[in-house]
Regions:
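Nucleic-acid endonuclease domains
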Residues: 1-81, 88-179
């Protein structure tokens, strides 16, 4: 597991990005689906963006700055060899997808927030926990209901761990696919 603390510029960049995303959604009358009854849509969006920034920082990748009315295309990061990654940020050590069709990237990475999910930008750190590919996820996930319907989950112990020195361009060896 890699622990990442974001600096002020990275946090402000994430805040600006989420503000632009929300302005874009308002302009195009796009309503967020709310999947966390104990948190605001804004905080959920911000926590996710901060997790993407932390993951990119920890793995030496660039974040996607594009903004689309319907949200991003599901691909949060890309390896230098063109493989796509979805970053899933949570407060619990479990990779969660709301629906089977939501895992569209080549890989998914779990990032866990250490801090207050309602104020994810204040005194927080992020842990890049583990990675899976689509095949392994769909072969090993279970269902869980957190109070708002069945979700597809994979616990931290079933993910391939990401530790200091992890090289994202070597993931083909982990999952047997060419990058």
């Amino acid at each position: 597991m890699i622990r990442i603390e974001l600096n002020e510029d990275e946090i402000m960049g994430a805040l600006r990005h989420v503000h632009r995303v929300r302005q874009n959604k308002k302009e195009f009358n796009v309503t967020d689906k709310k999947f966390d009854k104990n948190n605001s849509s804004y905080s959920v969006n911000l926590m996710g963006r901060l997790g993407e920034v932390a993951c990119a920082k920890g793995l030496g990748l660039s974040v996607d700055e594009s903004i689309n009315p319907g949200g991003d295309d599901g691909h949060d990061l890309h390896t230098s060899l063109g493989k796509s990654i979805q970053v899933k940020t949570s407060t619990i050590p479990t990779l969660i997808f709301n629906h089977e069709t939501n895992f569209i990237s080549d890989y998914a990475i779990l990032v866990v927030l250490e801090g207050d999910k309602q104020l994810p930008h204040v005194d927080s750190a992020f842990h890049i926990v583990g990675i899976t590919d689509r095949k392994y996820f769909f072969d090993n996930f279970t269902y869980h209901d957190y109070g708002y319907g069945q979700r597809l989950i994979l616990s931290q112990d079933k993910l391939h761990p990401i530790n200091e020195g992890f090289n994202i361009n070597e993931i083909s060896r982990l999952f047997g696919s060419a990058l």
